[in-house]
Amino acid sequence: MCARPSDKKIQDGPYDLPEERLQNLVELLEGYGRPFMLTSLKTASKLGLLRRIVLICLKNTRGMVYLQKHTESAPLYAGLWDVSAIGSVFAGESPEDAAERELFQQLGIRGAKLKAMGTLPYTDSRGASLSATFFLAGPSSWRPQRDESRSVDGMFVDQQELEGLALHQQEMLTPELIWAVQAGWIFRKAGGPFLAG
């Protein structure tokens, strides 16, 4: 004889937590990129555990991409130019939702069209394992409102300027930005190692 299932709701997981609590947790991923556990962002970062992040490059209506320069006191990549926005994907959040949230929190940009260019696992310079989804956002006519606690400068660059920096002055750029340029995810590759034809 089969037991009758209980009508009582079982509180069996952290996803039953209030939304404001979930926004402080990240999903740790197993080897196939599937979430298996929740933890705080601080714990995941400290231990270098595999988690998801988003990288976003914002383009204006002229096709130029916005870059931000990290502060000299930034814990990672101090003083280097980086993608427009970067951030963690919180528990229960899609990468698209995280990209929209980060664009608004870091640059004050809302409603920009997002296009996911790809997702790749990598290890950052601190040894943290990450699954990064790269997005192009825009074109947007809104001027980014830089968060001065995160960056000391911001600028729009065109394809030739960005590819010139990535080819000749890599020491000024984050590895993630160089990777995105070389992959042709910001501007299409037309010839050469990653230069426009």
What are the language-model segments listed below?
Residues 3, 10-55, 61:
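Acidic, metal-coordinating catalytic segment for phosphate/diphosphate chemistry
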Residues 173-197:
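Charged phosphate-binding loop/patch that engages nucleotide di/tri-phosphates or the phosphate backbone
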Residues 43-60, 64-101:
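Conserved Nudix-box catalytic region and its N-terminal flanking loop in Nudix hydrolases
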Residues 19, 47, 74, 125-127, ...:
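Sterically constrained small-residue positions within well-ordered secondary structures
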Residues 87-172:
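Unchanged
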Residues 35, 65, 128:
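Short, mixed charged/polar active-site loops
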